[in-house]
A protein has these predicted regions:
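Conserved catalytic cores of phosphodiester-cleaving nucleases, focusing on short active-site segments
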Residues: 78-80, 89-97, 144
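Active-site metal-binding core of divalent-cation-utilizing nuclease and nuclease-like domains
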Residues: 53-86, 99
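C-terminal globular interaction/adhesion domains in large, modular proteins
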Residues: 34-35, 41, 49, 63-68
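Trp- and S/T/G-rich repeat-edge/linker motifs of beta-rich repeat architectures
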Residues: 1-2, 50-61, 191-195
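Non-catalytic C-terminal interaction segments of nucleic acid-processing enzymes
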Residues: 140-224
Length: 224
C-alpha cells in the first residue's frame, strides 16, 4: 500500500470509507505519519519505559487472524510490528469514532450458532478469564486480544499491546467504560486514556492495553 485509499478494497463495505468515520480516519492517521507511529499512539507507548522509543517496522491494515476451527477470523484494523527499548512487540489497533464494541458475550452466544461454545472456551482459556464472569464483557475485545497474542506467538515476539485508537471527542470517549471493564477483568485496568496498563503474561507473551485519544484528520495538526 502506498496511499490511504489503498485500504478501501479490504474494508467490509466500501461505505465504511467516509470522512469522519474510523476506517477513513485510521488509514489517514497512519499514512500521514509517514513511516512513523501516529503521534497519539507513540505518546501512549512512551508511558511505559519498557516500550520507550517505539518505532514502526511494518503494519498491515485489516489483518485477519485465524482464532480456531469454529468460525471466522478476527480482523484487526491495524496490526503492526514495532521496535522498542525491550525488543520487538506486536501492536494491535482497534479504531473507533462513536461505534460500540458490539455485543456482549451473553448477547453474542444467545444466537446459539454452532461452534460458539468451542470458540468462547478457547478465548477464555487463552486470556485467562473467569468463564463464569465473561457474560457482560464485549466479545470483540476478547477476540481482538486473542488475535494479538496469536500474532505475537507466531512471530516469536514476547510483547503484545492492544490499543484503541479513539477519534471520539474527549468528552464522549465512546466505548471507554466497556474497555475499562474488560481490562479490569484481565487484571490490568486502563483507568484513563493516554496511559498504558501494566502487563499480564498469557502463554509466554506479555499483554498490555491502552486507549490512545486521537483527533479526526480535519482537527489534527499537520505532522512536523
Amino acid at each position: 500500500m502506498v496511499a490511504a485509499e489503498d485500504v478501501i478494497p479490504f474494508l467490509g463495505r466500501p461505505s465504511h470509507w467516509t470522512i469522519g468515520r474510523s476506517a477513513y480516519e485510521t488509514a489517514h492517521s497512519w499514512f500521514d505519519a509517514a513511516g512513523r507511529l501516529p503521534a497519539a499512539l507513540a505518546a501512549l507507548l512512551a508511558t511505559d519505559p519498557a516500550l520507550a522509543g517505539a518505532a514502526l517496522e511494518r503494519a498491515t491494515f485489516e489483518k485477519q487472524t485465524r482464532l480456531d476451527d469454529f468460525g471466522r477470523p478476527s480482523q484487526t484494523d491495524v496490526l503492526a510490528e514495532i521496535s522498542t527499548a525491550s525488543g520487538p512487540a506486536i501492536l494491535a489497533v482497534e479504531a473507533k469514532v462513536d461505534e460500540t464494541f458490539g455485543p456482549t458475550v451473553d448477547e453474542w452466544r444467545a444466537e446459539g450458532s454452532a461452534g460458539k461454545a468451542g470458540r468462547l472456551a478457547g478465548l477464555v482459556a487463552r486470556l485467562g478469564l473467569d468463564p463464569h464472569a465473561v457474560g457482560p464483557l464485549r466479545y470483540q475485545l476478547l477476540h481482538r486480544s486473542a488475535a494479538a497474542l496469536i500474532e505475537a506467538g507466531a512471530a516469536g515476539i514476547g510483547d503484545a499491546i492492544l490499543v484503541v485508537q479513539s477519534f471520539s471527542p474527549p468528552g464522549l470517549r465512546a466505548g471507554f467504560a466497556d474497555f475499562r471493564t474488560f481490562t479490569e477483568a484481565m487484571g490490568v485496568p486502563v483507568r484513563e486514556p493516554g496511559v498504558l496498563s501494566g502487563a499480564v503474561e498469557r502463554g509466554g507473551t506479555r499483554l498490555r492495553f491502552g486507549w490512545a485519544q486521537d483527533a479526526i484528520r480535519s482537527e489534527r495538526a499537520a505532522p512536523a
